[in-house]
């Protein structure tokens, strides 16, 4: 696997994409969308950030977020979200064996300027 370099810039805006494992349409189920919002609320208590925009599609989601200047590491935020979502997904369904919901890693893009911001908002 290639090594990815993530750029953590305090107070920056970041466009993030997380995709489900094998692009399974997890978010076609309204119960999973509720779980998405509940997980997000819990994670935001530990990793506060501003949600500038979002979209939830059947097999992935996009966030445009801004982190506080003292917490620029969004990898911890994404790890926590994906982990908590998976744990609660299993708990709700009383699943004890391993379940893979997410693709490894995630895609991120640090917003460079106003034009870049508008391009990602329009996406």
Locations of regions flagged by a protein language model:
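Short catalytic/metal-binding and nucleic-acid-binding patches
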Residues: 1-123
């Amino acid at each position: 696997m290639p090594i990815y370099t993530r750029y953590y810039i305090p107070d920056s805006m970041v466009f993030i994409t997380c995709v489900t494992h094998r692009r399974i349409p997890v978010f076609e189920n309204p119960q999973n969308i509720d779980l998405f919002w509940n997980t997000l609320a819990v994670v935001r208590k530990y990793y506060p950030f501003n949600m500038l925009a979002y979209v939830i599609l059947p097999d992935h989601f996009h966030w445009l977020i801004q982190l506080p200047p003292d917490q620029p590491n969004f990898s911890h935020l994404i790890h926590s979200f994906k982990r908590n979502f998976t744990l609660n997904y299993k708990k709700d369904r009383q699943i004890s064996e391993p379940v893979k919901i997410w693709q490894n890693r995630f895609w991120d893009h640090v917003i460079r300027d106003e034009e870049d911001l508008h391009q990602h908002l329009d996406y």
